Structure formats: C-alpha cells, structure tokens
Amino acid sequence: MNYRNIESVEQLYEMYNIKPVNMLTEKKGDGKADENVKQTTFLKDKLEVNYADLKEVSNIFKHIIVFTNDRDEKNNKTLKNIVEAINEFKKAKCEIIPELHVFVAADVDSKEDESEITIKDDEEEFVITEQNNTDTLVIARLGVQDEYDCEHIVKLLQDRGFLVLNPVQYAAIACNKYETAVLLQKGGIPQPNFTLMTKDILYDEKLFPEAMKEVFADWDVKDKDKNEDKEMVIKILDGHGGTGVFLTNGKKFYAVLQTIFAINPETQLIIQKKEEADGGDIRVHVLTLNDRQVILAAMKRVKLGGDFRSNVSLGASAEKVKLTPEQEQIALKTAKLSKMPWCAVDIMPLVKGSNKELGDNVVLEINASPGTDGISEVIGENFVRVLINQLKDPKEFYLQDKIAGYRESVTIDWGNGVKKEYLAKLDTGNGSSASHIEVGKYTEKGKKVTFTVEGKEFTFDIIGHSVAKTGNQEEHDRIIIKIPSLRLGLRQVNDLEMAIVESRDKSTNVLINRETLSNLGYVVSSRQTHILTPEMEKIKIV
C-alpha cells in the first residue's frame, strides 16, 4: 500500500501494522478513538518523530523550508521521514501540522514572479508568497553556501523578510575554519594560535617559516630538530563532524602536509597549536535574537578511546555540564559575533595555568549547522522543544541583516520639509573611515558649515574631521556633520555622522561605509546592484 493512496488513519495503521492504543479512552470509558494518541504512536514508534514537537512548531510556523545537502545524510533521513509522515497525515485528513518542504541544494532552482517565489528540485515544487514571511521558517543546513543557485534563493527569501536559520553569508564564515579563526581574533575571543596553510605557502622559503611563527612564537627556522615536540592540529577548512582533522607534531607534520597536497594541490588548511585540554570540549547551543540571547543547552563531549576528537557523530559520549560564568560569557559573545540566530559554540577548557595568555578556556569552532546528537538525552528534555519554546515571537528575528547591492538609492531627510534621493555606493571592503556625501559648495565659519539643498540653506555644527586619501595617495581633510536621517530600503538611521565633500566627477553622490551598513543591518553583495531600490540616474548637484 502506497501512502499516497491512504484516505484514513485506519489505513495508516494497516500499512505500518500498528495496533491503536487509546489511553484516553480507557480513562474516560467512552469508547471513542483519539486521533492524537494514534498520531503520536505512529510518529514516535515508527518514524521517531515527536508529534508534540511538530504541534508546537505549527503554533508559530505554517511552512518550514529546509535547504540541505547530500553530505548531510543523517539529518536528511530524519527530515525525509518527517516529510513522509506529514504527507500521510494530510492524505488521512488528520489534524493540520506544518507543511515541511525539503530541497537538496545541488538540484534546487527558483523563479521569481512579483511577490511569488517558486522553489523546486527533482522531487518537489513549492510556491510561496511574500505574505508568508511571518509564518515561514527557512532552515539552511550544511553545505548550502557551497551551491550558488541555492545561496541565491536563501538570500532572496532572507531579503523578503523570511526568518532564516542561518543567514548564508554568516554560515559561510562559520563553515570556513580559517575565516572563523580570523573572526574570533578580531572579536578578542580566546582561541589556539593559528595560521593558514596552502601548497604555495608550504614550498615558499620565506612564507612558510613566517606562517609557522604565527602558531609557535619560538618556532626555530634554522634548527628543525628543536621543533619536533611541538604538537599541532591540522584541519581542512570546510571539514565537518570531525572529518579532515589531523593531530601531529613538528617531526611528522611536513610529511603530512606533503601527502595532503599530493592528493589535492588546491586544498586549504588551518594549522592550530594544540593546547592542553582539561578533558573533552563543551558544546553550547546559543539562540541570539534582536534584544536577547539564550543559552539553550550545553553538553560536555568525552573523547572515544585514544581519539583526540570529541565529535558525538564519531562515537564520543556526551554528559551534562554546568557552565562556568566565563564559559557562558565566551559562548554568548562568540554567538553574537557570528551574527547567526542559532549556532553551537565549541569551547575547550584548558588545564589550569597551561597557557596564561589564553586563560582557562578557548573556542575551537562555531557551528552554523550544529548536529543535535545526544543533546536531548543529556539535558533531559527534547532539544527541539527547548528551541521552539524560545521562538514565540517571529518579529524578534526580522532585523536579520539583509542583502544590499553595491550601488543603491538612499533618501536623506534634511529637515524643514526637504527630502532628497541620492545614488550611493556601498562599501564592499575598502574600510572607509567615514561615510560621505556630496553637498556642492559649502561655507565653513568657525565651528559651523553652511550649504544649500533643493534651494534651501542649511547650517550644521562641525563635530569632527576625517582624513581621506585619493587614488594618488594625497590626503584631504573632510568636515564631519550629523545628518538628521538616512533611509536605505526599509531601514533608517538617525543622527548619522557623515563627511561632506564638494561635487566630484563620480558616478555616485554618497558613500556608505561598513559601520553605517552594520547599523542599518545590511551586508553588501559585490556582484549585484539595486537589490533594495530601483535604479536611478545620478542627481547633479548645482
């Protein structure tokens, strides 16, 4: 019997050879069948899916879209089981639970038509409208950021206001171990010393020793024998689940690197100094919302036998752990730095006094698509329910960073009824010290500056100066004022500090630097223009 032909709950039980157990009827003595009990039995016993969890999800989300990858085999099996169960319940006319749509990233395609977005792969086609952005959860699982078409779809949904776990631009950083390490370094998060390693660096007489000194300050360039006892961990940048990780030392590591690059010369690696761990590492699941953070769960992962890795997916055991205040602070700070709504932070406690510079704990990784193996058993309750219980108000997520083009239109409200639209360039990585705007001729007098907009004269206080370099490295002093209001897309920032410049022969009137973009909640696509706003001609300033 195929589930697509099922028309009743009784047929479900016949198909799966389930004898209905009606606990509620036995207590009440009314002899009536209870659909919820039947459904719960079917889900739990046959598909290992908890009906109560799905029911809780349905109170918040009517649609769940999952983008996944063939590499995520274990989780895909669970997801497909849930999809099958939901399809069967719909055919059997049972109680409504969320529509779940699972798309494999490598095969997915989309079509955008006004407010509708059609998503399809070899197995499914689903049409969703922008009106669904308040009742739809989008989950981007492992490997999605590797597929350009799928990445585009997720960004499209993200820009339309859909809740995405996790935004692909941040998940991509977390899935690259070197970029993660750089992010942690910028954020002042304690972590083992590290360096990037490629085949070109390995065989470069100057770059290789410089790289190794980033890992070991006392790395001896002349006497290699002095480096033999230095222990290090080598990781492939996009490895996951403990794969592509090697523990070695200064005596053997060169041969290990040569072997890896012989197999694939394009491989990129990160080398980390091996720190002295105090037992296994700790995985902390953190939910970061607009105005609050929640530690959902934590578990200590105990290594299996002689394996130095502590991944539960590799057979390591998990046990309950009480986080120290320092570990809580590190987990929360790291999660906020990642800009991902839900992530797992892997923290390794160090042997007391083993590294005075790092302290008692280091962060090993940030997981954008964390596995949940063992976590429910450790915390004594279903982890999915713990997560869902924190998602009571979807509006808490709607300030996720949106994608903007590198060229957009912005509107500035100067006050006194004057609003003007400008063509803006959005900083894609040059790191401009200040945003700036063309205002035409201006007059500086004392600590004030005056210029004209739309025929009206405006005077602003000078609050500072910035130094800008031109293409020929000449330095120019620029006056900084506070702009009353600037709007980009649907978002606005008030009292924005901007430098003013006279008219230049450029294609844009305004430059928005990265700090301002962050305040507005936008990240920039370096390949697209006018994602948020319609195209416009440059406005000439007279």
Predicted regions and their residues:
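C-terminal active-site "lid" helix and adjoining low-complexity regulatory extension at the edge
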Residues: 9-15, 46-47, 51-56, 319-322, ...
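Active-site nucleotide/adenylate-binding loops and adjacent lid/helix of ATP-dependent enzymes
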Residues: 15-25, 34-60, 64-68, 76, ...
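A short acidic-Thr-Gly-centered motif at the start of a beta-strand
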Residues: 215-223, 353-354, 407-420
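Protein kinase-like catalytic core scaffold
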Residues: 232, 294, 343, 362-365
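Short beta-strand micro-motifs enriched in acidic
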Residues: 285-289, 348-352, 427, 501
